[in-house]
Amino acid sequence: MKSGRFIGVMSGTSLDGVDVVLAAIDETMVAQQASLTWPIPGHLKKGILDICQGQLLTLSQLGQLDTQLGRLFAQAVNALLAQQHLQPRDIVAIGCHGQTVWHEPTGDAPHTLQIGDNNHIVAHTGITVVGDFRRRDIALGGQGAPLVPAFHHALLGHPTEKRMVLNIGGIANLSLLFPRQAVRGYDTGPGNMLMDAWIWRQCAQPYDKDAAWAKEGKVILPLLQKMLSDPYFAASAPKSTGREYFNYGWLERHLAAFPGASACDVQATLAELTAVSISHQVLLNGGCERLMVCGGGSRNPLVMARLAALLPGIEVATTDKAGISGDDMEALAFAWLAWRTLAGLPGNLPSVTGASKASILGAIYPATPELRVN
């Protein structure tokens, strides 16, 4: 069974940077050793947003973006290696999620697309890459997401305590870790995505630091109720979503009925939307003893305070309290999924994604001819 140092690379729906994590992994432990966040240049961020919001691109433009992102991921990995004084031979493999640009897991031809060419990562790092984790699950009838609940269960599951793990990235997702029950999990709806999109359009800021702007505003209840009436929130799990659905266009359609709304009031309402939509799902599943929060949204004091207020009797705290950095959780998960793939172990949970069976996930891009699975 493969064990040793792995690197996880994650570029999520928030587009707040490429997260890169170094970890020692074997069948008994996942020990994070180092991490960094690598910036995404503005022109790449724009290209990603254009695709996600349905703008037309030529195949040439898509191919260029795929190559450029692959090179960017390689730069981020090489920066971490240099920081830690490591050589490619010191790393077993890189687990790279890629950048999701479209996710449509339902219909006659379900599909998901992550770009960032793994061949370029191998070529520029000299390290084996495991990538393309989601499409096998979709081929087996699953949603292809979320995949991280399996990792949450491995690291944070408890034999007697009823726990949930909440990741608030661009999209928020919930993992239900209940004793003696199959793990479940799904996307609850928007996390940071709409808040970030609004403050970018209104103030040219990438995010609302410390929720300072949202705190200036007041929640517009009719707008909140209108947004919460979206069918996604009432849909049954398994379910997953992304920027192709909850985007600036979605927000504009809801704002059309509120032409005089104050910009900071809209921001306050979007923060409340995130907190309320999450808390509804926590309570719908019977609540828990501990809600462990990770992702960029765990650093939003307003959202965290509202979750605590909406969920009395539940301990709401970041995963940092359990010794796992909330900022690095997803990148760490994909390092672990790479280890699972090379060990010949399944990476998905059918109870989460709805797939017909558990399966080894991903495609392997070997750096050396000596690589063997399991």
Swiss-Prot record:
Alphabetical UniProt keywords: ATP-binding, Carbohydrate metabolism, Kinase, Nucleotide-binding, Transferase
Signal peptide range in chain numbering: none
Any one Gene Ontology BP term: amino sugar metabolic process
Top-rank lineage group of the source organism: Bacteria
One Gene Ontology molecular-function label: kinase activity
Catalysed reactions, as listed in the record: 1,6-anhydro-N-acetyl-beta-muramate + ATP + H2O = N-acetyl-D-muramate 6-phosphate + ADP + H(+)
Gene3D superfamilies (alphabetical): 3.30.420.40
Cross-referenced SUPFAM superfamilies: Actin-like ATPase domain
Binding-site residues for ATP, renumbered to this chain: 12-19
Biological or metabolic pathway of the protein: Amino-sugar metabolism; 1,6-anhydro-N-acetylmuramate degradation; Cell wall biogenesis; peptidoglycan recycling
InterPro entries xrefs: Anhydro_N_Ac-Mur_kinase, ATPase_NBD
The keyword Iron is annotated on this UniProt entry: no
CDD domains, sorted: ASKHA_NBD_ANMK
EC assignment: 2.7.1.170
Sequence similarity: Belongs to the anhydro-N-acetylmuramic acid kinase family.
HAMAP family: AnhMurNAc_kinase
Function per UniProt: Catalyzes the specific phosphorylation of 1,6-anhydro-N-acetylmuramic acid (anhMurNAc) with the simultaneous cleavage of the 1,6-anhydro ring, generating MurNAc-6-P. Is required for the utilization of anhMurNAc either imported from the medium or derived from its own cell wall murein, and thus plays a role in cell wall recycling.
NCBIfam families per record: PRK09585.1-1 (NF007138), PRK09585.1-3 (NF007139), PRK09585.3-2 (NF007148)
Protein name: Anhydro-N-acetylmuramic acid kinase
Gene assigned in the entry: anmK
